[in-house]
Amino acid sequence: MLAQKRSFQSIAKSLGRYTSTISREIAAGSCNKYTYRANKAQARAIRNSHKRRAGRYDLDDNLRLKRYVYRKLRLKWSTTQIAKTLEKDYPTDIGMRISPESIYTYLFVLPKGTLKKELLACLRQNRKHRRKQRRGVEAKRKLEDMLSIEECPKEVEDRIIPGHWEGDLIVGKNNRSALGTLVERTTRTTILIPVKSKSATDVAKAFAREVKKLPKQMRLTMTYNQGREMASHKLFTKITGVKVYFANPRSPWERGTNENTNGLIRQYFPKGTDFTKVSRYEVKRAQHQLNGRPRKTLDYQTPYEVFDKLINS
């Protein structure tokens, strides 16, 4: 068509394309106004595609960086955690740098296969809204002798003094199994607790068993929702000496640290997990990995690092 000296408008009309599209394509593959080389345009398209895919850094060109990124992804670190920790681990090595966006870009353009599937599964599921965890009609009944969150010491809200925890249960398949979760508000240290059942007595004893292992200065308070599984809170307090305060109904933000952490835990135990089939080893491995992740809110230190500094200071 160009050889026939037809205009861009005429070519666009014949091909059912916009004139601007024809103009850009010819500009990309032309030697002059009236010659178009499809192979030249294709080669340029491939080069541009590679640049877009590679992002600022191409991990395939830096094996050491690639191994580092893969290793941390398999520990379920976020791309931001990886990028920030690289700066700490290699402060003078510019070659060991990559942005979070470049990691995402690299992963999503990997060829389809087992490796891509494995690495993408390590990324967090960024839902816009987290579903409320319903406790049923029983959750609306007030627990006997419960202390309201309004009565909490002010130091709990300030997060300056460690030893204040938030607790919850992650419910498993068919609402028949569960995993207890505890998160320390200052250090973000997480404890995962296998429970025999969701009965109040079993939950209180399981939580107490783990809390008793903590240094005394790290056992001050616990904030929980008004679920019936914590109806034996007085038994828990008797065993541990830790007072339990209860958040208001339908107010997950009052235990925001725990709610956020439950989302992270779902990376290891997705919704629908049957916790009766999850071994204690699997639970503790997930706990270890969670506490070994650098956190933005901790200036990219890990919960383990901050916890150890506080109890040894």
Question: Where does each model-flagged region fall?
Answer:
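Acidic/histidine-rich, metal-coordinating catalytic segments
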Residues: 218-231
